[in-house]
Amino acid sequence: MSTEYGIALGMIETRGLVPAIEAADAMTKAAEVRLVSREFVGGGYVTVLVRGETGAVNAAVRAGADACERVGDGLVAAHIIARPHKEVEPVLALGNSSPDRS
């Protein structure tokens, strides 16, 4: 990969944690991508983010979306940004975030 996280950004949003885990597992097995974050959006929605080369991210997101659909009605959205603009990078949640419990 050309940078620490790669070039492309792949996103899958799910209803519930189980479809998100299934999608993350399928994405990392399907292609050479790095799982960089998962976000608990609220209301039971979870977003999983991967980075890597464009072709790998495309294959990973397709595999993750297919796996998520096999779990049930969990897939909300799947999207790929081939080359996110540098101004977008600070907005992305690229750490391991978790809900604030304080």
UniProtKB/Swiss-Prot annotation:
It holds the Pfam family BMC. One of its GO terms (cellular component) is carboxysome. Gene3D superfamilies: 3.30.70.1710. Its main location: other. GO terms for biological process: carbon fixation. It is found in: Carboxysome. Residues 8-93 form the BMC domain. InterPro entries: Bact_microcomp_CS, BMC_dom, BMC_shell, CcmK-like_sf, CcmK/CsoS1_BMC. It comes from the Bacteria. Keywords: Bacterial microcompartment, Carbon dioxide fixation, Carboxysome. PANTHER family: BACTERIAL MICROCOMPARTMENT SHELL PROTEIN PDUJ, PROPANEDIOL UTILIZATION PROTEIN PDUA. One of shell proteins of the carboxysome, a polyhedral inclusion where RuBisCO (ribulose bisphosphate carboxylase, ccbL-ccbS) is sequestered. Assembles into hexamers which make sheets that form the facets of the polyhedral carboxysome. The shell probably limits the diffusion of CO(2) into and out of the carboxysome. The tight homohexamer forms a small pore which is positively charged. Homohexamer with a small central pore. This is Carboxysome shell protein CsoS1C. It comes from Hydrogenovibrio crunogenus (strain DSM 25203 / XCL-2). The lineage of its organism: Bacteria, Pseudomonadati, Pseudomonadota, Gammaproteobacteria, Thiotrichales.
